[in-house]
Amino acid sequence: MSKFDKHKEYKLTLPRKYYEKKGLSGIQNLGNTCYVNSIIQCLSNTLKLTDYLLTNGYKKDDPREINKTKNNFNITLSYIFVLKKLWEHNNVIQPLSFINKLKNIKQVTNEQQDAHEFLLFMLNNLNENLSYPININFSDKLTNIQKDITLKFYNMNKKDYSIIKENFNIMFLINIKCKQCNNEDFMYEQSYDISLSINKSHLLDELLDEYFKEEYIEDKKCDKCNFKGCIKKIYLWNLPKYIIIHLQKFDNNGRKINKHIYYSNSKINYLKYFSPNREARHNYFYDLYSVICHQGNANNGHYYNISKNLNNKI
């Protein structure tokens, strides 16, 4: 997980010294819960989110506080309790209540689970229970196509926006262009992560180039001229403060791809992946601050987390 370098100076409610000295607690495994523990540690070191939850920031955004009419609202409440324990003292905690609530909805079983899937579950759960409606005002400087695309994304998020979407939601603009008549269609997608196949390179920047490169679709028919053959290209439309990069470490048969992927903070500028219709105002470099690691295979393995605190110590 990486954070945008423009936000190195955190605007936190709690004193910076609080985050420099605390949050070094461990989490005891309670059965096959290492995937849960690693995600908790990763999210705990996402300080914009942690500060928001520790200081009850959700009460300021929405007077309803946590929406208890939503599904699994008790998971969110229990996670906040775990978070407070993690940042109370630097020791080992046992998140028994949180794990039991996850067991009740089959998110924790007697078998090994996938950390990436659990991360998405947690982000969706937190977003659902911390969400509030939003409005939008268009700038006079936007072009018609920019207004149209912005409106599409607004309609996708206007009823359930939260600090989760503010900090993690990636917006993609997918361009489909006919090779014959150059007619263009657009699709709009959003995600909490960029999921990369790691087959073609061991360098993260090359894997990203592969993900965002043009793709020829032979059997796609143009809506305008009926010609078969289009070019598909994925663009970024908006990037959040934090980017989650998911490396697909298992193939379609469940076999683990034992391959190291190398990352360079100073090398990747995500600006080059933005849509030409989007006028990005600055470069997009991100600092790596947290990694979920896996040892073993799909059936018998162990997850653990490596994170940096505000002192850049692991």
Predicted feature residues:
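Exposed substrate/partner-binding surface patches
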Residues: 1-22, 43, 56-70, 86, ...
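USP/UBP deubiquitinase core
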Residues: 2-143, 242-247
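Processing junctions and N-termini across compartments
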Residues: 28, 172-175, 215-219
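Beta-sheet entry/capping signal
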Residues: 33, 175-177, 242, 304
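Predominantly the structural core of cysteine protease catalytic domains
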Residues: 89-157, 169-171, 180-182, 214, ...
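Internal, well-ordered alpha-helical segments in soluble enzyme and binding-protein domains
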Residues: 118, 160, 174-177, 221
